Amino acid sequence: MKAQEIIKSIEAEYLKSDLPTIHVGDTVRVGVRISEGGKERIQPYEGTVIAMRNGGISETITVRKIFQGVGVERVFLLHSPIIAAITVIRRGKVRRAKLYYLRDRVGKATRIRQRFDRPL
């Protein structure tokens, strides 16, 4: 058994199986676990997926939103225990794998057309 196969078999135990299918351009709501003191709560973070990186357990999505007029981007490890839930709010129709051009746009220019051929 090769080393790469051993690593994949160990990582397979920690992969989440209940993740929805996410594509670039989708609007998602990510529930992030935050522990303050002795309490734990789930904070929602909603935005547009502008990038995805595949790679087994290190699979990530970059989510962008506008907060108080400032663009905020956050990278989430999909299989991390910090992420409680991911829900797709809206499907987006884009023709790029990375939507970094949205960083330079302001206001209504950042809108993405809705896609109806994929179910939520």
Curated annotation (Swiss-Prot):
Keywords: Ribonucleoprotein, Ribosomal protein. It comes from the Bacteria. Pfam families: Ribosomal_L19. One of its GO terms (molecular function) is structural constituent of ribosome. GO terms for cellular component: cytosolic large ribosomal subunit. SUPFAM superfamilies: Translation proteins SH3-like domain. This protein is located at the 30S-50S ribosomal subunit interface and may play a role in the structure and function of the aminoacyl-tRNA binding site. This is Large ribosomal subunit protein bL19. It comes from Rippkaea orientalis (strain PCC 8801 / RF-1) (Cyanothece sp. (strain PCC 8801)).
